[in-house]
């Protein structure tokens, strides 16, 4: 058998297994190669109708009619793959699939109903249906199925257990009783309302009469007040008009006085202007005479001054020229000297630079030598430490001996005590002498020995340090030791 091209319809998928496919391949169209198997499965939802028998927490049975629209989840590849593996080998309308879905729904419904009382189920029907829907969906997820719609009908009594019918009768009777109560309350409200309306009518009539009297008196008072206000406004208007007339007369008098003052000022200004003009003309005449006299004097003395000025200018220019030439020569000489000093400084700088580079090179080589010496010493110490079995104390002693540290310490100590004249005293408490064998033994003998050692000890301390013992301990006389006991 050769290659075959397979195409699925709009509500179908192809499940391909076999050669070259690790698990299951889902596709809408594909080439089927030899060694492969292609299976079609429909993903359209199916309606499942059930009447689930459950029991509440009080052990009361009931029937839950339900219609579930269930199908594979087309927008999730994982769900489709699970459906293709678990459900697609069977017809979706087969008894096997029907029993599977029914078992899931009945199981979740019974578990949920067993945790609730009948009153809770009856009062919270909507929440109960939602809980059934959510729990069933969780179980169907493992088969790749999704609930498209769930229509849970009204709860029904089981034959011989009429709990819901009794609850309905109870509700109906409560509604009838509530209706009677509502009718009685409405009749009571009507009678009470009629009496209240009659009383309110009388109260409103009396209130209107009182308000009418008050309004009449109030309007009369307002009329009197308005009349007095109008009279006052008329009087104020007359006073304002009289004040405006007086103000106009005062303004007219002030304007007349101002006009007279301006006329007098104009006459005075005219007279002063004539006098000022006469003085200005006289000043012009005097200025003209002075200018003519100045020109005459300039003509007499200016020619001589001009000649003297030109001669002095020529002399100043010649002297300036000589000074400029001398300054230029001096500047040229200073520039040459500066160039010579610059060249000398460059040569000295070059020489110092070479010396610095040579010194830097020498320091670098010296540092490299120190580094090499340090590396060699490090290798030497590591080898010695290994030869001595890792004993740092033995390595230290060897290094001190090889470097002459002990010899140097001995030399320093010898230099420190050179020139000193130490006094060495040796004494004995005479415990081994025959003359003292007869003395008391034990503790008293030891105490006697200590007291005998004190005099020579104090004498030696005095000879070497010059210090005397305290008076309570003993005294030294004539260089001979003495003690008190």
Swiss-Prot record:
Q: How does it sit in the membrane?
A: Lipid-anchor
Q: How is it modified after translation?
A: May be palmitoylated.
Q: Write out the GO cellular component annotations.
A: caveola; plasma membrane; plasma membrane raft
> Which keywords belong to this entry?
Cell membrane, Coiled coil, Lipoprotein, Membrane, Palmitate
Q: Does the keyword Lipoprotein apply?
A: yes
Superkingdom per UniProt = Eukaryota
Q: Which residues form a coiled coil?
A: 228-320
**Which positions anchor the lipid (S-palmitoyl cysteine)?**
38
Q: Work out whether the entry's keyword set contains Ion transport.
A: no
As given in the record, the signal peptide range reads none
Localization per record: Cell membrane; Membrane, Caveola
InterPro entries, A to Z: Band_7, Band_7/SPFH_dom_sf, Flotillin_fam
> What is this protein's function per UniProt?
May act as a scaffolding protein within caveolar membranes, functionally participating in formation of caveolae or caveolae-like vesicles.
Identify the PANTHER family for this entry: FLOTILLIN-LIKE PROTEIN 1-RELATED, FLOTILLIN-RELATED
Please give the name of this protein.
Flotillin-like protein 1
Q: Which organism is it from?
A: Oryza sativa subsp. japonica (Rice)
């Amino acid at each position: 058998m050769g290659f075959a091209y397979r195409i699925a319809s709009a509500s179908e998928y192809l499940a391909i297994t076999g050669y070259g496919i690790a698990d299951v391949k889902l596709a809408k169209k594909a080439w089927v190669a030899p060694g492969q198997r292609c299976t079609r499965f429909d993903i359209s939802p199916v309606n499942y109708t059930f009447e689930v028998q459950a029991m509440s927490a009080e052990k009361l049975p009931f029937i839950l009619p339900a219609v579930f629209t269930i199908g594979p989840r087309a927008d999730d590849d994982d769900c489709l793959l699970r459906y293709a593996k678990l459900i697609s080998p069977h017809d979706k309308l087969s008894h096997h699939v029907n029993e599977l879905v029914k078992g899931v729904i009945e199981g979740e419904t019974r578990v949920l109903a067993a945790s609730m009382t009948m009153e809770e189920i009856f009062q919270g029907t909507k929440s109960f249906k939602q809980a059934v829907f959510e729990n069933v969906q969780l179980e169907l997820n493992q088969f790749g199925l999704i609930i498209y719609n769930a229509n849970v009908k009204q709860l029904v009594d089981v034959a011989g257990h009429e709990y819901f019918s009794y609850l309905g009768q109870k509700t109906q009777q409560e509604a009838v009783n509530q209706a009677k109560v509502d009718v009685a309350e409405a009749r009571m409200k009507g009678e009470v309302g009629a009496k209240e309306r009659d009383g309110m009518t009388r109260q409103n009539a009396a209130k209107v009469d009182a308000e009418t009297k008050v309004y009449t008196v109030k309007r009369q008072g307002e009329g009197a007040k308005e009349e007095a206000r109008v009279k006052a406004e008329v009087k104020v208007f007359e006073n304002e008009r009289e004040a405006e007339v007086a103000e106009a007369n005062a303004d007219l008098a002030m304007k007349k006085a101002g006009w007279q003052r301006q006329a007098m000022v104009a006459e005075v200004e005219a007279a002063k202007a004539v006098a000022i003009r006469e003085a200005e003309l006289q000043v012009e005449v005097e200025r003209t005479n002075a200018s003519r006299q100045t020109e005459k004097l300039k003509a007499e003395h200016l020619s001589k001054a001009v000649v003297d000025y030109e001669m002095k200018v020529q002399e100043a220019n010649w002297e300036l020229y000589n000074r400029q030439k001398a300054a230029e020569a001096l500047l040229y000489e200073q520039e040459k000297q500066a160039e010579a000093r610059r060249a000398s400084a460059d040569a000295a700088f070059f020489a110092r630079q070479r010396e610095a580079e040579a010194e830097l090179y020498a320091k670098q080589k010296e540092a490299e030598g120190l580094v090499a010496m340090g590396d060699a010493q490090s290798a030497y110490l590591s080898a010695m430490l290994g030869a001595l079995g890792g004993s740092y104390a033995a390595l230290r002693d060897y290094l001190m001996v090889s470097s002459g540290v002990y010899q140097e310490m001995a030399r320093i100590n010898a230099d420190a005590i050179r020139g000193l004249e130490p006094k060495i005293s040796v004494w004995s408490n005479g415990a081994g002498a025959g003359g003292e064998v007869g003395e008391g033994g034990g503790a008293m003998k030891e105490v006697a020995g200590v007291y005998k050692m004190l005099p020579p000890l104090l004498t030696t301390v005095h000879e070497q340090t010059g210090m005397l013992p305290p008076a309570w301990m003993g005294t030294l006389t004539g260089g001979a030791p003495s003690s008190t006991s």
